[in-house]
Amino acid sequence: EKIGSTGSGTGPANSDRAMRVLKLAKDFDSLSSLVVDVPLEINSAISANENVLIEGTQGTFLSLWHGTYPFVTSKDVTASGICADVGIGPTKVDEVIVVFKSYVTRVGTGPLDKELSLEDAEKKGWSEFGTVTGRQRRAADFDFDLARRAIMLNGATQISITKLDVLFSECEGKTSYDELSEDAKAFVKNIEDELNTPVTIIGTGPGVYDVVDRRN
């Protein structure tokens, strides 16, 4: 069964690096002016008390080490793996924010517990298409077991919830927690209680500023 790769070349590149046959950007004269010492740059910024945000890609369970193998990507995508990618040690990290969608989606093959039919997903407004592949995403209700394990694997200290407005349309564009409906607040509170982790950032729409920020 095909895994459903994006076909972007990342897997072959990671494979070549593991085999130590990959040429790096620094090996090409045309790219040499664009190459910097990323670990030095990032650690220097941290030492200077600058704010540094490191954003990872993909979902926890696409991790090569901790995901639903073999239906995974070609590297580790957990918080520890992301830090290793840019060259910072674990003691340099203050906060780990894990991002959950208000429901679960998956592109391509692989397990998806309590998966909805495409028809039911469309009725709920959960019909989505992958930004890279253009393939339709499969959907399921929020999975507390997956979320709990993601919290553990990433050492999360905060939770960000996206697409709350898809579940609760009355919350679209809201920027204050007090403006959210009681049903939406109950949904957020249940996540906090079940996962014992605060929900600090809530997405309420597609716009950059469609966000409820509960951080001090």
Feature map (PLM): residue ranges:
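Non-transmembrane, aqueous-exposed alpha-helical and coiled segments at domain scale
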Residues: 1-216
